[in-house]
Amino acid sequence: DNRDGAIREDDGTLYVAAEGHEVAYKIENLCDRRYGVGADGLMLLDSAPDGFDFKMTYFNSDGSGGMMCGNGGRCIVAFAADQGINHFDFIAADGFHTAEIVSQEGRTKIVRLRMKDVSGMDRYDALTGVSCASEGCFMDTGTRHYVRFVDDLDQYDIVSEGREIRYDATE
């Protein structure tokens, strides 16, 4: 039974999902990789304003507020279903989202999530002051992403290149 809280993994990213704000102050300890569950973040399933089924509140593993995350959004929908919620129009930090569970086998659910439309691609990130290399850009899907264009994806070392981009302060 997942009614008291859940640890959800989606695409290699680990999240803790829980109801209400009673656990918010413990986020950093819960997510700690050595002494906690080692999660990438914590999401709270909260009551929402009229017109929505629930509110997703996302926190980064250090306890700071986070933005919408697609993997996390699918996980919170699966958790909401475990709580008896069967309609998935929800609000998150970036606005409205809708989802559906397209299949389920045992406790495994396949969730289709509608993300916000990307409004544009920028070569400069005003929030961080970072300029992109000519082969990439920033876009916002609820959370800022860096996208790099490549000619032959099969020959591209995604893991190494992704690690380099993520931890390079100039990109």
Over which residues does each language-model region extend?
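A glycine-rich beta-to-alpha transition motif near the start of alpha/beta enzyme domains, typified by
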Residues: 1-108, 147-171
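Beta-strand scaffold of nucleotide-dependent catalytic cores
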Residues: 57, 113, 137
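Short glycine-rich anion-binding loops that position phosphate/pyrophosphate groups of nucleotides
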Residues: 61, 118, 143-144
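Solvent-exposed residues in well-ordered beta-strands and their adjoining turns
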Residues: 102, 114-118
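Short, solvent-exposed secondary-structure boundary/capping segments
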Residues: 107-115
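Short, charged/polar, Gly/Pro-enriched secondary-structure boundary elements
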Residues: 119-123
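Internal active-site segments that recognize and position negatively charged phosphoryl groups
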Residues: 128-130, 134-155
